[in-house]
Swiss-Prot record:
One of the record's GO cellular component terms: mitochondrial inner membrane
Record keywords: Electron transport, Heme, Iron, Membrane, Metal-binding, Mitochondrion, Mitochondrion inner membrane, Respiratory chain, Transmembrane, Transmembrane helix, Transport, Ubiquinone
PROSITE patterns attached to this UniProt entry: CYTB_CTER, CYTB_NTER
Gene3D superfamilies with a match to the protein in the record: Cytochrome Bc1 Complex, Chain C
Binding, a ubiquinone: 201
Membrane topology type: Multi-pass membrane protein
Compartmental location: Mitochondrion inner membrane
Record-listed heme b b562 binding positions: 83, 182
GO biological process: mitochondrial electron transport, ubiquinol to cytochrome c
Protein name: Cytochrome b
Top-rank lineage group of the source organism: Eukaryota
The protein's role, per its UniProt record: Component of the ubiquinol-cytochrome c reductase complex (complex III or cytochrome b-c1 complex) that is part of the mitochondrial respiratory chain. The b-c1 complex mediates electron transfer from ubiquinol to cytochrome c. Contributes to the generation of a proton gradient across the mitochondrial membrane that is then used for ATP synthesis.
């Protein structure tokens, strides 16, 4: 078996990635989320494939086909709710994975980090298009509002929006193409994940100290395969509790009403995992400014390697920046809450304050805190 594992052209790639991979001896449970994201991706592709067998991407029948899946298809209700709540689990793992990267300075592995940002954009695009497919009220109006933001692009904006819509409004052509893109993107994401891993294995994993761990490595299997398996069990338990006991808790009741272009819902809002970005978008009164802020809210992650001023990599031994980090986490939670609230006083001013704080913490306060910590170290 050892000979096949190490000599076979295909199996040796798997061996070097998941079995004989040298891993730091001290990586904590925060390093479990990579494997959990892989599990989420596989789950989403499988459940999505079975849903696609019964779904019809036509405005006249899309809503009915989802109802048919839930009522008439064997375990269709389970597949549908696993797919819908699987997206939420995917984003929970994604946010924790990115948060871990920011905390422990993993952004210094620039190729891996940038590929991660591309993956984040791809997953967000996929989730957005997936939300349109059931063709409920929030699907239709969410698609209308978000795609319409592209009209803020000078000169080509209106043409671009009509090109994406395939007409003069969100209609049959839009739904069909969104289904096509929603189907193909997860496979593109899978390819990007392999590139992400390729870049990661060029440098090796970071660790909680942020120090070089070349002198203290252990094989990935059995140590981290067992550790990852525990994470998988915990995730599956949380996932099945969510899916079987509270399947609609994260959804919007408006999406149980078929799409009606003549009736606007009182509060148009995206799924919970986009609310922080939606709050940043709404906090700027100018349309183009809002769109730029929306894109920058994610793209700012790409600036992190440039904004790193500390002599230390991780925040493990940096109490001032640690404080800034947890204020940033709290700020993101506030933005998520604001994104789900109506556009009225006092939510407008809270959203604007939280949006300014978000960019200020990342661009100004954390780099300054890093320099202060450097000076404190020099004093010693």
């Amino acid at each position: 078996m050892t000979i096949i594992r190490k000599k076979h052209p295909l199996i040796k790639i798997i061996n070097h990635s998941f079995i004989d991979l040298p891993a730091p001896s001290n990586i904590s449970s925060w390093w479990n989320f990579g494997s959990l994201l892989g599990l989420c991706l596989v789950t989403q592709i499988l459940t999505g494939l079975f849903l696609a067998m019964h779904y019809t991407s036509d405005t006249a029948t899309a809503f009915s086909s989802v109802a048919h899946i839930c009522r008439d298809v064997n375990y269709g209700w389970l597949i549908r709710y696993m797919h819908a709540n699987g997206a939420s689990m995917f984003f929970i793992c994604l946010f924790l994975h990115v948060g871990r990267g920011v905390y422990y300075g993993s952004y210094n592995m620039i190729e891996t980090w940038n590929m991660g940002i591309i993956l984040l954009f791809a997953v967000m695009a996929t989730a957005f298009m997936g939300y349109v497919l059931p063709w409920g009220q929030m699907s239709f109006w969410g698609a209308t509002v978000i795609t319409n933001l592209l009209s803020a692009i000078p000169y080509i904006g209106t043409t671009l929006v009509e090109w994406i819509w395939g007409g003069f409004s969100v209609d049959k052509a839009t739904l069909t193409r969104f289904f096509a893109f929603h189907f193909i993107l997860p496979f593109i994401i899978t390819a990007l994940v392999l590139v992400h891993l390729l870049f990661l294995h060029e440098t090796g994993s970071n660790n909680p100290t942020g120090l070089n761990s070349d002198s203290d490595k252990i094989p990935f299997h059995p140590y981290y395969t067992i550790k990852d398996f525990l994470g998988v069990l915990i995730l599956l338990m949380a996932f099945m509790i969510l899916t079987l006991f509270f399947p609609d808790i994260l959804g919007d009741p408006d999406n149980y009403t078929p799409a009606n272009p003549l009736n606007t819902p009182p509060h148009i809002k995206p799924e919970w995992y986009f609310l922080f970005a939606y709050a940043i978008l709404r906090s700027i009164p100018n349309k183009l400014g809002g769109v730029l802020a929306l894109i920058l809210s994610i793209l700012i992650l790409a600036l992190m390697p440039l904004l790193h001023t500390s002599k230390q990599r991780a925040l493990t031994f940096r109490p001032i920046t640690q404080t800034m980090y947890w204020v940033l986490v709290a700020d993101l939670l506030i933005l998520t809450w604001i994104g789900g609230q109506p556009v009225e006083y006092p939510f407008i001013i809270i959203g604007q304050t939280a949006s300014i704080a978000y960019f200020a913490i990342i661009v100004i306060l954390m780099p300054i805190a890093g320099m202060i910590e450097n000076n404190i170290l020099d004093l010693d």
